[in-house]
Amino acid sequence: MSAFKPLVFSGVQPTGNLHLGNYLGAIKKFVALQETSDCIYCVVDLHSLTAQLVHEDLADQTRSITAAFLASGIDPKKHIVFNQSRVMQHAELAWIFNCVARIGWMNKMTQFKDKAGKDRENASLGLLAYPSLMAADILLYRATHVPVGEDQKQHLELTRDIAQKFNNDFSDRIARLGVGVEMQVGEETVNGFFPITEPVIGGPAARIMSLRDGSKKMSKSDPSDLSRINLTDDADTISKKIRKAKTDPEALPSEVSGLESRPEAENLVGIYAGLAEMSKADVLKEFGGQQFSVFKPALADLAVEKLAPIAGEMRRIEGDRAYVDAVLRDGGERAGVLAETTMKTVRDIIGLLQG
């Protein structure tokens, strides 16, 4: 077992409105984790520059994500909520990790291939190095656990590789300075400065698909607003989008295996499961054999019950810009203290001249 103090870190990019997929796949999990763990939740505004350098409303989008965190129930007094660019040590450690990571590792990242597409030569260096910054975000606070979606699992594996390589490359200095922590890596007990961070994955609705196409992930970039439920949608809009969600003509099955090859049905059952905190199997025990004309109204009622209060609270919080800025400022100051403590030791381990 790791001797590191358990700590959860996760971040969300401030690019576009948050939607149901973000809520069930990430934010709802953030809220649950804060009951059992110390947590740091970050609006990763520097990451948003990797795909698009010029933004018209980056500051307002940062406030909007923060408002969503707070409206969903994240407590900024018990935990830390801040935006990444307030803490300069993220960029400092990312540069060091650029020197630890291997180009071959980066070239294997499927998300870079997907986002760069066929025009890789015109992709930004920041997009290629995105996983190094993500590793720095996590390891700057020596976080032991990170809630991640399936699309970020590979990046977290790279974070673990970077931590292990740093620990191995500087093992003698870490031991000499007495800053190592004994931990279990596989079957081996090792001494390292950075933890080998564990993913927190899963839940019945970890991956939410488009309401218009069950084969595509729900996305804020989809041109059809009917494809997603935004966290800012009011009750009437939520109900309308669920009523119009694409389905097939068959009744719901009684077993989860019956959802195979029925992506839209599986998606709606998954949404119900995530909102109700049930398994898909339990949802089908209740609704198996019934038509979507029965299931959709029940899902709409549940979604309105769970999501409409968040939308209302988001609007209230976004209207108090001074409060949102104060939360981010306070969180940034607290995060900065932790970050500088880590970086002082990292500089000593590397041998950079300080003071």
UniProtKB/Swiss-Prot annotation:
Motif interval(s): 'KMSKS' region: 217-221
Enzyme class: ligase
Assembly with partners or alone: Homodimer.
Annotated compartments: Cytoplasm
Keywords attached to this entry: Aminoacyl-tRNA synthetase, ATP-binding, Cytoplasm, Ligase, Nucleotide-binding, Protein biosynthesis
GO annotations of cellular component type: cytosol
Binding-site residues for L-tryptophan, renumbered to this chain: 137
Listed GO MF terms: ATP binding; tryptophan-tRNA ligase activity
Main location: cytoplasm
InterPro entries: aa-tRNA-synth_I_CS, aa-tRNA-synth_Ic, Rossmann-like_a/b/a_fold, Trp-tRNA-ligase, Trp-tRNA-ligase_bac-type, Trp-tRNA_synthetase
Gene: trpS
Binding site for ATP: 13-15, 21-22, 149-151, 208, 217-221
Enzyme Commission designation: 6.1.1.2
Chain ranges for the short sequence motif 'HIGH' region as given in the UniProt record: 14-22
Catalytically driven reaction(s): tRNA(Trp) + L-tryptophan + ATP = L-tryptophyl-tRNA(Trp) + AMP + diphosphate + H(+)
Protein name in UniProt: Tryptophan--tRNA ligase
Family that this chain belongs to: Belongs to the class-I aminoacyl-tRNA synthetase family.
Annotated function: Catalyzes the attachment of tryptophan to tRNA(Trp).
Residue ranges of the TM segments: none
Origin: domain of life: Bacteria
Single GO BP term: tryptophanyl-tRNA aminoacylation
